[in-house]
């Protein structure tokens, strides 16, 4: 838990965030005086990329070693998914979900209710034994769907591990985003693990990245980036000739490439997530 006392460098894509009065998380350079919870990795990035100064209020630290087994597991799953994607095997989506659960399960919030299904014959007896914990019930056909309050007293998670995973994933993005800004390369949109930038600058950024970090930016391995557009029939580079961004995870790219005969082909890359239905 820290209090930010100084921000030395403002960024187009700020690293730290605060919650507004309405509960919306806002990434901002205007965080002087803000009190926030932060882990070691995110704090190092805030110092390195935005030159922040801070006061430590309180916190936890671990000094008895570090279990890195997850590194081997994620490497195995990544290699397996890469192989399945090459074979166009839809099972790769299952591996993707398993990989996502590496952090999702560690920061799982308490599950406050559970749904129990009972037949008409079982319903009255179940209610009589569990009435103190019944939140609601609804009859569907010949069965009852009962929402039961679940005790959270036994709930636990590994939030300190999940935070570390998320912060390392953000560092991968932070290294690229801040380097692009420092080299006056335009990043038009950023998501969790991707970004939109000018096609002619795609070759410039990797060179600067290798010079600074002594690693390859472009490739198909973990922590590397590559052009990720898909267009049926494309035999050349795929790029967007026009894009419209409405909000986070709400955008469309007009894609263009050439087919095997050299003819220009086009298609759409559309994302529309987190839009309320009412």
Residue ranges and their predicted role:
Residues 1-278:
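Conserved acidic
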């Amino acid at each position: 838990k820290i209090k930010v006392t100084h921000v030395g460098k403002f960024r187009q894509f700020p690293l730290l965030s605060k919650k507004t009065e309405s509960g919306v998380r806002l990434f901002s350079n205007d965080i002087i005086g803000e009190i926030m919870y932060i882990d070691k990795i995110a704090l190092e990035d805030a110092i390195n990329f935005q030159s922040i100064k801070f006061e430590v209020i309180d916190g936890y630290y671990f000094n008895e070693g570090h279990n890195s087994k997850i590194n081997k597991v994620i490497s195995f799953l990544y290699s397996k998914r890469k192989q399945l994607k090459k074979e166009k095997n839809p099972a790769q989506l299952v591996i993707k979900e398993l990989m996502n659960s590496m952090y999702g399960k560690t920061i799982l919030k308490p599950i406050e209710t559970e749904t129990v299904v009972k037949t008409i014959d079982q319903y009255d007896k179940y209610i009589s034994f569990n009435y103190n914990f019944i939140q609601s019930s609804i009859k569907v056909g010949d069965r009852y769907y009962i929402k039961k309050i679940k005790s959270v007293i036994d709930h636990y998670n590994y939030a300190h591990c999940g935070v570390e995973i998320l912060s390392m994933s953000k560092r991968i993005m932070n290294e690229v985003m801040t380097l692009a800004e420092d080299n006056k390369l335009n990043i038009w949109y950023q998501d969790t693990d991707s970004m939109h930038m000018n096609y002619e600058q795609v070759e410039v950024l990797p060179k600067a990245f290798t010079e600074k970090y002594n690693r390859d930016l472009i490739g198909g391995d973990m922590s590397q980036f590559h052009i990720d557009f898909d267009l049926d029939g494309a035999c050349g580079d795929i790029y967007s000739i026009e894009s419209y961004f409405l909000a986070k995870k709400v955008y469309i790219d007009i894609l263009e490439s050439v087919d095997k005969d050299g003819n220009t082909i086009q298609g759409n890359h559309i994302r529309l997530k987190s839009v309320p239905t009412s």
